[in-house]
């Protein structure tokens, strides 16, 4: 993929992340590249992050590693549509997109399946 194509792809995902952040239950929406870097999106304006920058970078790296490890089972179990964790302070969902991951965190009171469907619709995945 050329630099221009990458740039256009990341711009497209920036727009999708911004659309996700308009939803009241969404705290964070970002695209993580295969190197574990946030390349589009981020935290909703006015929202206080639950992790500092260093911990977020660790989270991104761990997420990419986990998603790539899960792909080993795609042949037998089918591709992962999304993964979700309900934590005490946030619901965290990840959506594999080729070799990247859309990472979304939401308020704890969300219905995970309903929210995941909404995210997939808004993000076009």
Regions found by a protein language model. Name each.
Residues 1-125:
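Non-catalytic interaction/Regulatory regions outside core domains
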């Amino acid at each position: 993929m050329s630099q221009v194509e990458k740039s256009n792809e990341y711009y497209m995902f920036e727009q999708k992340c911004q659309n996700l952040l308009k939803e009241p239950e969404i705290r964070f929406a970002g695209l993580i590249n295969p190197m574990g870097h946030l390349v589009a999106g981020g935290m909703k304006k006015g929202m206080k992050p639950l992790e500092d920058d260093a911990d977020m970078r660790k989270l991104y790296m761990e997420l990419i590693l986990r998603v790539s490890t899960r792909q080993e089972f795609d042949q037998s179990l089918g591709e992962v549509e999304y993964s979700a964790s309900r934590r005490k302070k946030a619901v965290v969902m990840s959506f594999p997109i080729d070799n990247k991951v859309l990472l979304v965190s939401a308020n704890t009171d969300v219905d995970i399946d309903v929210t995941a469907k909404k995210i997939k619709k808004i993000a076009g995945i």
